[in-house]
Amino acid sequence: MKFEKNTDIFILPDFIRIQLESFHRFIEKGLLEEFQRFPVIRDSSGELSYFLNGKRYKLQEPSFNEQEAIYQASTYSSELYVPAQITHTKSEKTKSEIILIGNIPIMTARGNFIINGASRVIVNQILRSPGLYYGSELDAQANITYSCTFISEWGGRLKLEMDNKRRIWVRLSKKRKIPVLLLLLAMGLNWKDLEKLISRPSLLLSYLSKEKRTPYSPEEAIIELYRHSCSVSGEISFSENIRKELYHKFFKIRCEIGSIGRLNINKKLNLDIPEEERFLVPQDLIAAINSLIEKSFKIVNLDDIDHLKNRRVHLIADMLQSQVRIALNRLKRMIAEVMRGINKRKNLPNPQSLVTPKPLVATFQEFFGSHPLCQFMDQTNPLAEITHKRRISSLGPGGLTQKTATFNVRDIHPSHYGKICPIETPEGQNAGLVSSLAILANINQNGFIESPFLKLHKNEYKQLTGSEHLCSEQEEYYRITTGEHSRETAEKKGKPTPIRYRQEFSATAFHFLHFRDILPIQYFSIATSLIPFLEHDDANRALMGSNMQRQAVPLLRPEKPIVGTGLEGQVALDSAALVLSKIEGKVDFVDGRNINIRSNIVINEFFSFQLINYERSNQNTCLHQKPIVKKDDYVKKGELLADASSTLGGEISLGNNILVAYMPWEGYNFEDAVLINERLIYEDIYTSIHIEKYEIEVNMTSLGPEKITKKIPHLSEYLLRNLDVNGLILLGSWVKTGDVLVGKLTPREPGESLRLPEGRLLHAIFGIKASSFFETCLKVAPGAEGRVIDVRWVESANKLTQKYIKTVNIYILQKRKIQVGDKIAGRHGNKGVISRILPREDMPYIQDGTPIDMVLSPLGVPSRMNLGQIFECLLGLAGESLKKHYRIMPFDERHEREASRKLAFSELYQAKKFTGHSWLFEPDTPGKSQLFDGRTGQTFENAITVGKAYILKLIHQVDDKIHARSTGPYSMVTQQPLGGKARRGGQRMGEMEVWALEGFGAAYTLQELLTRKSDDMKGRNEALGAIVTGNLIPKPNTTPESFKLLMRELRCLCLNIHHCSLFQENLSMKNIEF
């Protein structure tokens, strides 16, 4: 970040630099560190040794680019080569070779990975930082017990507790603990030393029984510690193997604190142990015990576990480095096993023959395929991409879980100020556990989050002396004020300046201050910073607005927002979705796929830019780049050449500016329902493009290969009409539900055809054997239709199984216009579902005759307290009339009271003067106007708020959710229809739905839903037969299957319950068996 002194001019940082810098650190340092740990491997006799020279490792350039990796459904990776040497120590013979260790996935310039053709992102994880932490808790008798916890680099914990009798224990698990004296003696200390080093040594002996008044010897201590930590019973004698096993199972997991933990412990305990010592040493434990004793006798401040100074971010470099460590350990074991079987009398083998790429390839496949923090990239729009890369999660291995996370962990902490956004977090179970980095926040190499501040100079004439990045711990020592305060304003007001100091908010004189903030929005995430008039919105609604902007689908004709915050260009630029010129020159050629530029510096040098053309994203939205330059245009380096699918003119454009009115209309906008004008459909204002991928594999079965062919038996010619002679769909074909995309036949077992009724009939009448293949064609899914835009044959080799897999991928493009049931939203958390589409002539219209585009409910504003939408729509109306765009930083009222209201009204007044339309600003009802009813031509009774709002179309669309079924699968246990569209489920009546029908007295409807349409097996067969034959549907008279299930479960509890039928004629009863 760059600043000019004595000014507020600065350059925003690259929003995805954290990902890129972290991966660069992994390549430059992480790999080297892991290779340096790799030992020289020797065989059991010590004659052969195998050595990897990790300092000279090399990464080859990927064999194909990112686009080819996506097209071929392969991984964008680089081969890792390391010099290796095998030596026979007796004969001193050596063989050296540069060997292939495996492939490492490479991060793209956009900060993501391409794994098997799909874009993936590694989410940063925030965990407790290694080190020492003091705390207190209540025991079973409600007494306060003090504890100190050592957290290792691997997440293991070593907890020391002091109970109410002043005895100190080492906690092994919830139910097991041992005296701390055992641990100290097992670490090599003797009792004489402990008497001198511990401040109150009598506390260590308080646990001993009367019979044993002398402490254990070191060997006895090791045996006792081994017995308790490894849960071993019986007689154990001391041996060196026990010491080694104790080291691996206890000390390595719980006591390896790393360099960060060493710094933390040295600082808290005032020790000067070298940073290279990465394990706990006896001095650490002794100092911690003395400190714990001291804290138990005094009232002192304990550590706040939720403070960011006690939490560290695990970046991409840390996660990938740990995977390389796992892979190299596997490789080490593999080499050692191979070396056991080498005949030493023969020639030395080549180093490559002892190594295979499987350990590294398998480890990364497992990591990218199943690790919870390695996720499919959210590619709904560029904002969703960039937000996903800046996400921080407390979940995952070594972290919290949704069930165990308490309210304190999820809550906003004062140390988050300027580092983690207090607004943007998911709704639901992950609230507070998944967060987003603040807009200017950075993560340093140790994993601590920093925020930049402008340093104030004590000299009266020099206010600023540059900027500094401070982490949470450093911040506590400085007095920091907000960005709008300066020496001049403080002197004019003559009042103390509000500051924050040591997590408290207070006020002091300006000359005592050290730093001030840079931006009023530096505390918020990118998505939250894109909300204009953010300060007028309730935090809950701002959260929804932040999340819903990421769900906006790219539109066919997007518009820039009339009212924005000024960050729209930076977000589009840093998302890497735009195409920028890398050289200065003249545009030589441009079309929809390529832009060629002739260099202005080097003669006859051309630079070609390949554009993304109707590619599918992970969320089935459309990735597309549109050139904005023309032939013979002169461009400079860094100038925009092409827009992406959700950008316009280099700014992020997620929606459209439309004319809205806040008024009720015949109940069609009750609650969150929305009424829209048909203009939005006919003019493609909210039309979006979606691309669906259909995939089918062609396998070699045990009975022979599967066939791709057009000749499919038992299917009509109509369903096969779009196939070419080879059985693949023709490019450009329009397909509907059920149409065949790929004709495929799979071999059937010999004799299986004769077991089928149709096979036996053909054989009996004509003597013809039925086909030895059955149809397994790829068909268009129910409810889908569209145009085929691509057909791809993909041949991929599995490096682990050495098998080649042939796959056919079909891409179908669909244009979706807005319709009833689609979800729309603004940027202020104001969301709704389309309830009705009205003709233009029936919509209310303003005084110049323009019909309203969207009618929103006015009751959705006051109770939700998101007044920012009102300011936005009024200022948008003024901007539309004045042909202006506004870029307003949130918190504009820091300069003046009612600044937002004054700005909106003054701009409406200017629009009234500019256009001559008096209705734009009426002094009696400012911001409101008289509307006319499109059906009658009469005015509405009251003035109505009208304006231009920026409305988004969200990815929650009715085409993806609507579902109907006539027949389908049933659950084997309850015999009720399955749930969900994906499983072809049916409508399921829950308890509350039954109550609703009971309330209306719909007895017959209720009976039908609870019997025939649910789990009455006999009744539904009878109903189907009656429908087919055209007879009346009989009344259900059999027992539903769910009732039978209840009876069986009660019988399992030894309750003898019978189901009886009562006859109306003679009131006789009959037991019904089932």
Swiss-Prot record:
Belongs to the RNA polymerase beta chain family. SUPFAM superfamilies: beta and beta-prime subunits of DNA dependent RNA-polymerase. In plastids the minimal PEP RNA polymerase catalytic core is composed of four subunits: alpha, beta, beta', and beta''. When a (nuclear-encoded) sigma factor is associated with the core the holoenzyme is formed, which can initiate transcription. InterPro entries: DNA-dir_RNA_pol_bsu_ext_1_sf, DNA-dir_RNA_pol_su2, DNA-dir_RNAP_su2_dom, DNA-dir_RNAP_su2_hyb_sf, RNA_pol_bsu_bac, RNA_pol_bsu_CS, RNA_pol_bsu_protrusion, RNA_pol_Rpb2_2. Keywords: Chloroplast, DNA-directed RNA polymerase, Nucleotidyltransferase, Plastid, Transcription, Transferase. It is found in: Plastid, Chloroplast. The keyword Ion transport does not apply. Its main location: plastid. GO terms for biological process: DNA-templated transcription. This is DNA-directed RNA polymerase subunit beta. It catalyses: RNA(n) + a ribonucleoside 5'-triphosphate = RNA(n+1) + diphosphate. The lineage of its organism: Eukaryota, Viridiplantae, Streptophyta, Charophyceae, Charales. Its EC number is 2.7.7.6. GO terms for cellular component: chloroplast; DNA-directed RNA polymerase complex; mitochondrion. GO terms for molecular function: DNA binding; DNA-directed RNA polymerase activity; ribonucleoside binding. DNA-dependent RNA polymerase catalyzes the transcription of DNA into RNA using the four ribonucleoside triphosphates as substrates.
